[in-house]
Amino acid sequence: MLKGRIALNILQSQKPIVFSASQQRWQTNVPTAEIRNDPEWLQAKPFEEIPKANILSLFAKSALPGGKYKNLEMMEMIDALRQDYGNIIFLPGMMGRDGLVMTHNPKDFEVVFRNEGVWPFRPGSDILRYHRTVYRKDFFDGVQGIIPSQGKSWGDFRSIVNPVLMQPKNVRLYFKKMSQVNQEFVELIKEIRDASTQEVPGNFLETINRWTLESVSVVALDKQLGLLRESGKNSEATKLFKYLDEFFLHSADLEMKPSLWRYFKTPLLKKMLRTMDSVQEVTLKYVDEAIERLEKEAKEGVVRPEHEQSVLEKLLKVDKKVATVMAMDMLMAGVDTTSSTFTALLLCLAKNPEKQARLREEVMKVLPNKDSEFTEASMKNVPYLRACIKESQRVYPLVIGNARGLTRDSVISGYRVPAGTIVSMIPINSLYSEEYFPKPTEFLPERWLRNASDSAGKCPANDLKTKNPFVFLPFGFGPRMCVGKRIVEMELELGTARLIRNFNVEFNHSTKNAFRSALINLPNIPLKFKFTDVPN
């Protein structure tokens, strides 16, 4: 036991020699001499009184045979910690990670977000940060991208890409291209479903991932990859699909599980670095293809007005490296996340046929025929579609929580928490709580409709909405809100509308433990959806 304690103390105190999350401390706009002496601060309890998990006990429960937390999924472990310590707990740092305060109190979420500063620090993505700031600094120096960067470098990059990615008019350019992708998705479903049962294979998640990568590539690379067609199965695109799958799989292991990669280069770290190199290599090839295409068009006298230029074209006008890194970030962050969200929506609609029927009524007005094209005007009139997407994100949230580094001293759950502390916000219990969402176990898109006419008199929508907006933030909040929000919303809206217009969707299997916790919540069951053709 003594040897174990000594080893644990060494592991806790030794500075990582490969990489540490604290090697790149966030820059803040906090006055260094700020001292709070207001009544709220003075009346709050000291930081030291926050319930604290003992590191030795935590290690034993998590890693040793018979430990209470051993083999638990992330959400199960968080629930167990909540039962043991309450709604706020301090978790000590370990194996190169910083300690953090974890809170389940939605009132704290607002405090944290209101005090995140102009350059919010979001912990995580350490492996990607290591790849870009250390291992491949020669390429990424000065342009680290949206996902791993912090401080001023993040702010500078975000200020470049925000006007391009967050403008609704720029997203609308992709209606026709997305429509083509979705038509191919529909045809592929018809090909792979069983002729007698109309069910797709249990590995349907791979098909969904192909659809999401195809969709995001239309924006990120200004190109359809052909992943939904027979001709695209042995292409460069297939390699990219494989590399991104490996990236997400290994990220979960290196970021979430106890690992020594921060102390020495483990075999998994080396494999991950090769994977990220491969993603970079393939992305560069596609960006170079786009540059050649644009140069050829310029020689031929093709000139597009500003409002018709693609996202990639606009970013290339700024800087090739900026365009390449942003494309990589969109690919790395835009596949599994959208796939999980889309899966959750399909499960909710399949298990609630009356909601699906109402959604189809709305979609039929937008798409009178199965092959009708989407228009900007028609897609403004789909409130129930947007409500279904939003409610599915509440029922099956994509992430367990969010985290920020405090930029000023703050009172969290009645305790004085100093600036520089990482606070992890866990809303998932509140999403299922009657206190915040009446009838929380029911899938009720009506709760998100803005007025009584939208809810068709079937449900007092205002009575079902949460009174605390910080409980439910599927795309984050503030300056660090998801930069791809509008793109993801477009993918989900167009893809869902096309499927519901073509198919009645059923899921005649259990949805128990439908998702498992990794970096995000991932589908955990065979997705044997039944797709029955809708009559014309």
Curated annotation (Swiss-Prot):
Binding site for heme: C482
Organism whose genome encodes this protein: Drosophila melanogaster (Fruit fly)
Assigned keywords, A-Z: Heme, Iron, Membrane, Metal-binding, Mitochondrion, Monooxygenase, Oxidoreductase, Transit peptide
Name of the encoding gene: Cyp12a5
Cofactor: heme
Known EC number: 1.14.-.-
Highest taxon above the source species: Eukaryota
An annotated Gene Ontology molecular function: monooxygenase activity
Keyword Metal-binding (UniProt): yes
Protein name, as recorded: Probable cytochrome P450 12a5, mitochondrial
Subcellular location: Mitochondrion membrane
